[in-house]
Design a protein with these regions (language model features):
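Bacterial N-terminal signal peptides that target proteins for export
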Residues: 1-9
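An acidic-aromatic
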Residues: 63-111, 172
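Bacterial N-terminal signal peptides
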Residues: 9-17
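Boundary at the C-terminal end of the N-terminal hydrophobic targeting segment
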Residues: 22-26
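A short, Trp-centered hydrophobic/proline-enriched beta-strand micro-motif
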Residues: 37-56
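Short hydrophobic/aromatic-rich beta-strand segments that constitute the beta-sheet cores
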Residues: 49, 71-75, 90-93, 137, ...
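Gly/Pro-enriched, hydrophobic low-complexity segments
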Residues: 121-199
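Solvent-exposed strand-loop boundary residues in beta-sheet-rich modules
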Residues: 53-55, 96-98, 168
Length: 200
C-alpha cells in the first residue's frame, strides 16, 4: 500500500497554488505568457515516460490525458500499477494483486491540473526560470514544503519533464518521450481495468 501511494504522490502532486517570480525582461514575459497559453490550450496528450526516483529506481510506462478530467498512467512490467481518473475519482490499481483504491480527485493536487483550475493571477507560489533554452516552473505551498517542477523546451515550446521534490529534497523525475498532442483518445482507456469493493 505504501508503495502505491508513494508512486501516486510522485505522479499526482502535479499542480500547487501558483506564484511566479519574473524579471521585467520582455523575453521572460513573452515566454511566461507562452507557457500560460500552452497550458490553457493543452487538451489531449499521449506519451511514453521514464520515471527516475532519488534512489535510482527506474519505472517506465505510458501516459494519456484528455482535459478536463481524464487521465491514464499505465506502468509496464515489472511494475503493475495503473492510475486512472474520470474527472471525479482517481483510481489506483495493482493489476497483479487485483487491488483497487479510489480517491476523490478533488482531494489531490492533480485536480488543479486535470480540471484546468489554473490561477496564474495568484502570485504567491510559483517561480519562473529560463536557462539554456529550458523553461522551468516551480510550484510550492511554502519554502519548506514539497515542490513540483514543470520543464519545457523553449523552442519549440513543449512540455518535456516534471520533477517532484519532497520536503527532504529527494527528487523524482518523470521524463516524457514520443509526445503526441491533440490526439483522439477513446473514453474507454480512462476506465479502470477492473473493480473491487476496496476503496479509501
Amino acid at each position: 500500500m505504501f508503495k502505491i501511494f508513494k508512486t501516486l504522490y510522485f505522479l499526482t502532486s502535479f499542480i500547487f497554488l501558483f506564484n511566479y517570480e519574473l524579471s521585467a525582461s520582455p523575453t521572460n514575459e513573452n515566454n511566461f505568457h507562452a507557457v500560460k497559453e500552452y497550458l490553457k490550450n493543452l487538451n489531449t496528450l499521449e506519451a511514453s515516460f521514464i520515471q527516475i526516483s532519488n534512489d535510482g529506481d527506474i519505472k517506465r510506462g505510458k501516459i494519456f490525458f484528455n482535459l478536463p478530467g481524464k487521465l491514464r498512467i499505465d506502468y509496464i512490467e515489472p511494475d503493475n500499477l495503473l492510475i486512472t481518473s474520470n474527472g471525479f475519482w482517481l483510481t489506483v490499481q495493482n493489476k497483479k494483486l487485483k487491488q483497487t483504491n479510489n480517491i476523490p480527485l478533488e482531494r489531490t493536487p492533480l485536480n488543479l491540473f486535470l480540471n484546468k483550475k489554473f490561477n496564474f493571477e495568484d502570485n504567491s507560489n510559483i517561480k519562473f526560470k529560463i536557462e539554456n533554452d529550458v523553461i522551468t516552473l516551480t510550484f510550492f505551498e511554502d519554502q519548506k514544503a514539497s515542490k513540483f517542477e514543470l520543464e519545457f523546451n523553449s523552442n519549440p515550446l513543449r512540455l518535456r519533464k516534471w520533477v517532484i521534490i519532497d520536503e527532504f529534497e529527494n527528487k523524482t523525475s518523470v521524463m516524457l518521450q514520443n509526445i503526441e498532442m491533440d490526439v483522439k483518445l477513446s473514453n474507454k482507456i480512462f476506465i479502470p481495468d477492473f473493480y473491487d469493493e476496496k476503496s479509501d
